[in-house]
Regions:
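Short, Lys/Arg-enriched N-terminal segments with co-localized hydrophobic residues
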Residues: 1-8
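Conserved acetyl-CoA-binding loop-helix of GNAT-fold acetyltransferases
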Residues: 93, 98, 104-117, 128-129
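A conserved beta-turn-beta hairpin within the catalytic core of GNAT-like acetyltransferases
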Residues: 82-93, 103
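A short beta-loop-alpha structural element at the N-terminal edge
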Residues: 10-24
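Short loop segments at secondary-structure junctions
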Residues: 70-71, 101, 164-168
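Active-site rim helix/loop that mediates acceptor-substrate recognition in acyltransferases
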Residues: 27-78
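Conserved active-site alpha-helix within GNAT-family acetyltransferase domains
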Residues: 121-125, 130-156
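C-terminal "cap" of GNAT-fold acetyltransferases
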Residues: 150-187
Length: 187
């Protein structure tokens, strides 16, 4: 059952006690039904990634947020430390997950807006992500290569995106690298 709108939503920092609910959000949000070409898939990759980022100490806790709907964790956004030219000078957004039954009612957008505000308040110069080129530009994201930040793999520039924040300064450029948990996904 999909809801048409949400009556009451609270965005807050994630707490240690939210870990199981956050995992459940990502498992559900990234699950794919079986098709003729592929078997069903749980969102274990994204859920494990969030768990690994947390275990490695690479999450930026002030920016990792949950959305509660009627007291239940229904969405989550992870923000982790990222590197440019091997310096930990940026943060990366993702995964961003929302329970399927409350998708398309503004929870993901609210989480993105709130986490961008939190990153800006912390003095982060920019937020980088690998994401859908028609969803993220509404939040001010554009190709990272336009700002001198190059992706770690051969992703199209329309998918590797950056949003400058108030602390952005000239001279920040070079090859981008995610936290180690992202790099282990390729293993």
């Amino acid at each position: 059952v999909r809801v048409a709108r949400v009556a009451c939503m609270l965005i807050r920092r994630e707490l240690p006690s939210d870990a199981d609910a956050i995992r459940a959000v990502h498992l559900a949000a990234f699950a794919k039904p079986a098709t003729d070409d592929a078997p069903a898939r749980e969102g274990t990759l994204e859920a494990d990634l969030v768990d690994d980022l947390r275990a490695d100490g690479d999450l930026v806790g002030e920016c990792c947020l949950v959305a509660e709907v009627d007291g239940v964790v229904a969405g989550h956004v992870a923000i982790s430390r990222a590197f440019v030219a091997d310096q930990p000078v940026l943060v990366a957004l993702g995964p961003l997950g929302v329970l399927p039954e409350v998708q398309r009612v503004g929870i993901g957008s609210a989480l993105v807006h709130a986490t961008l505000g939190a990153a800006d308040a912390l003095g982060e110069p920019a937020v980088v992500l690998l994401g859908h080129p028609t969803y993220y530009p509404r939040f001010g994201f554009g190709p990272a290569v336009d700002h001198g930040i190059t992706p770690p793999q051969d992703w199209g520039p329309q998918y590797f995106l950056l949003r400058r924040l108030h602390a952005w300064g000239d001279g920040l450029s070079g090859p981008f690298r995610y936290a180690p948990a992202f790099e282990r996904l390729d293993d």
